[in-house]
A protein has these predicted regions:
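Extended, subdomain-level signal for the structured scaffold at the beginning of enzyme domains
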Residues: 1-130
Length: 130
């Protein structure tokens, strides 16, 4: 089977795009390797896991925890289960640093996205990944 590289930023990646893809690739028998800027596990966009902050009133400190629309917009239950399983996987817990990645070592590349520029910017603008 193929060896697939999934580079992710330190934070704010979309948990559904990463975890569901990871789950499908593993289920199909592929080997998955993660890579992050410094070789430490990344953190998904918490807003997409909890739904907090996705409602119209999400910017109001006292109301942030009240989710209505946010519950519909967050990652669904299956994606959250896949994310929880991915967090326990050795490949996710011990990623390569981006500078350690060698193109010849991999058969495929998956570039997942995210919603918030604050964490995704380093990933999108990385000269190493380009």
């Amino acid at each position: 089977m193929a060896k697939i590289l999934i580079p992710i930023p330190r934070r704010d990646f979309d948990p559904t795009e990463v975890a569901v893809s990871f789950s499908v690739l593993k289920r199909l028998g592929h080997s998955v390797v993660f890579a992050t800027p410094e070789g430490r596990p990344g953190q998904a966009d918490d807003m997409m896991l909890t739904g907090q902050g996705l409602d119209f009133w999400g910017f109001v400190p006292g109301l942030r925890r009240l989710t209505a629309i946010g519950r519909l917009m967050r990652a669904n239950a299956a994606a959250r289960r896949d994310y929880a399983a991915m967090l326990q996987d050795a490949a996710f817990q011990a990623p390569l640093a981006w500078r350690q990645v060698r193109r010849a070592d991999f058969d495929g590349l998956l570039l997942p996205g995210g919603h918030r520029a604050r964490g995704m910017r380093e990933y999108l603008e990385s000269v190493v990944l380009q």
